[in-house]
Amino acid sequence: LQEKHQYPVRYVSSEGHEDVMIEHVTAVNGNDQEAASEAIAGCDIMATAVGARILKFIVPNIVEGLRKRWARTDAPLNIIICENLNDANKILEGMLKEQLSEEEKALFDARVGLVEASIGRMVPVQTEEMKDGDPMRVCVERYGFLPVDLAAFKGEVPEIQNLVPFEPFDFYIKRKLFIHNMGHATCAYLGGYVGRKYIYQ
C-alpha cells in the first residue's frame, strides 16, 4: 500500500461487479507504535475497524497517540468505532482508561469522542478468487452509508461523505440488528439450502 498509495475496490451484486480505485492512501504498520501513535496524534479524525477480539491490541497505540496529541494541542479527537460489538464505546473507553492516569482521564473525558457506528456494509473474508490477482483488492456490497452516534462527538461534527450522524443512536443499532443482520442471516440460510457459497450469488 505504501508503494502504490492506492488499492482496488470491487462492488459486487447479483448484476455483476464494478471496479474502482481508491487513491491517495498511506499506511502505517500497527506493530510500529511510534508511527501509529504519530498518525493518531496528528489526525483530524480516526476510526477502528479491527474486529472485537483485536481491539485490545490497538489500545496501547491509541493511548500513546493521545498522550502525544494532548502535549501538542487542545483539539478534540473523535474516534469512530466500526466494530460489530454492543456497547463498543463503553468497552473501548474502559480499555483505554485502564492505561491512563487520573489527570489523563480528565483530558480524555473533555477531548475524546468515542463515536459508535452502525456497520451496514458487508465485507466478506477475501478469498483468492475475490482478490482476482491483486492481494489488496477488497470486494464489498454497494451500500455505503455509515450511521454514527451524533451525541458522542466532541467539538464540531465533521462533514464526511456518506457519514450519517444521528440521535438517538440506539434506534439505528436495534434496526440494524433486527432487520439488516436478520436479512443477511436469512439469505445465508436459504442460499446454503440451494447450494450457494456467497450471499451475493
Locate the predicted segments by residue.
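Substrate/ligand-engaging "lid" and interaction regions
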Residues: 1-23, 27-201
